[in-house]
């Protein structure tokens, strides 16, 4: 929905505890974003993954981007919707450490 509830994991003497509600924000959360992406950009007969990836060193993201692009090339429908493939939603450069991408395949 349009309300985001932030939580927090806290270290205590006994281990970890979850604080279930630190704050509530009016914002587009990932459920809304994924629904908008699906309805606007994906072909109806596909399934996909919205991935947020972290890379530990410079160059890792760029290498992964090259491998995924080669292994899963983008295919579009006649009306321009994503039918299958890997599609980066963020720029990937030599110093990139975080990346968001879609990976889509036919059901």
Q: How would you label these PLM feature ranges?
A:
Residues 1-107:
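ATP-dependent carboxylate activation and anion-phosphoryl transfer catalytic cores
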């Amino acid at each position: 929905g349009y309300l985001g509830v932030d939580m927090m994991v806290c270290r205590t003497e006994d281990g970890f505890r979850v604080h279930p509600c630190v704050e509530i924000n009016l914002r587009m959360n990932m459920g809304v974003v994924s629904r908008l992406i699906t309805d606007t950009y994906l072909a109806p007969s596909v399934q996909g993954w919205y991935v947020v990836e972290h890379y530990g060193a410079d160059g890792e993201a760029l290498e992964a981007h090259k491998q995924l692009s080669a292994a899963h090339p983008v295919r579009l429908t006649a009306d321009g919707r994503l039918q299958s493939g890997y599609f980066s939603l963020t720029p990937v450069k030599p110093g990139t450490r975080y990346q968001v991408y879609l990976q889509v395949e036919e059901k």
